[in-house]
Amino acid sequence: MVVEADKKALICSFCSKKQHEVKKLIAGPAVFICDECIDLCTDIMKEENKVALKQITSSIPTPQKICGILNDYVVGQDQAKKILAVAVYNHYKRLEYVQSGNNDVELNKSNILLIGPTGSGKTLLAQTLAKILDVPFTMADATSLTEAGYVGEDVENILLRLLIASEFNIAKAQKGIIYIDEVDKIARKSENPSITRDVSGEGVQQALLKIMEGTVASVPPQGGRKHPQQDFVQLDTSNILFICGGAFMGIDSIITSRTNHSSIGFAANVNMDKEKNNSEILKSLEIEDLTKFGLIPEFIGRLPIVTTLDELDKEALITILTKPKNAIVKQYQKQFELDDAELVIDDSALETIAEKALAKKTGARGLRSILEHLLLDSMYKVAELKRQRVTITKEVVNGLVEPIMTSLISTKSNKKQPIIADIPA
């Protein structure tokens, strides 16, 4: 409410100027703020936004450096890494360009869609990118989202998580990365528009359109449904990078059907396509395949960069076990080392673990659960016994024998280091 000049003399709660010394006084609950203080606050916020952006853009590594860091954590997926590195680099350079005020050419935001089987590294790629760039990052599960007004999470809750990740620093949050997982689960139930309401499928896609494209969203800082009377935080999503990921189970059949359409009746061609693995089929992905799968054209349009990830083979899984900086075997060996113990996993055991993960079709995600099951009893015992070497062989992985435990003779001056088995050539 605006306080007019004929009212009783009032002062600004911030600068203490009287009402006749300023143009306007805006009243709040027991406080007042003048137009000059409002202008000053606006200038301060603009300056803070510039500083926050400069901190991010000044430290952006080149695409080759981004790819190099990704190689330390993610095995394989070279083409996907290259596409992501270029896309992220261009995104943050775009922010620098927009902030400079040079708007002779309008640069649009390029969100990313990752398509690949379970455990192929989609989530890890997004997490590692955020770590490299040192920007706020949050993950959301698309399966929990519903259209506003229905049981489930509103899409604004995704923005709330980003605000929390940035410690409610709005300027930082507006330059963050949001990863939406399982986006294939919000595909509409049929290719044709439905006359009934699809609140967890097409309805969620429609709700995501605005925030993905760029809008000033009203975010409830305490969650939207339980506290309807709260004040909202205004968050501009124009510069937030959205990365969506999903396995898109069954899309290979859609692609194969399209590519074989012109050769119906020629069984030889169909049989040749059947011999292709999913990774090869996905390389032929077209926009029309995503539409047929159940994504609406408007939603696909908000994700101009689409990249597919390869299915991991046995060699890749063995590498994942031992080579990255945060390799699973290295993590378990460090855990044993903290108990003054040693963990040794031989080559044949690594191969068998990889084969089991392949058989379960869980990709890299299944490796940890297999190792956790194998090492549970050993971790239970070694904390009491200490100074033990635990050896895992192929027979142990296959459940034929128990993990081999032998006593270690170790001293503080000659402490044995964890051993990682060599990967067969």
From Swiss-Prot:
It holds the Pfam family AAA_2. Disulfide bonds: none annotated. ATP binds at P117, T118, G119, S120, G121, K122, T123, L124. Residues 1-53 form the ClpX-type ZB domain. It comes from the Bacteria. Zn(2+) binds at C12, C15, C34, C37. Signal peptide: none annotated. Component of the ClpX-ClpP complex. Forms a hexameric ring that, in the presence of ATP, binds to fourteen ClpP subunits assembled into a disk-like structure with a central cavity, resembling the structure of eukaryotic proteasomes. This is ATP-dependent Clp protease ATP-binding subunit ClpX. It comes from Rickettsia peacockii (strain Rustic). The gene is clpX.
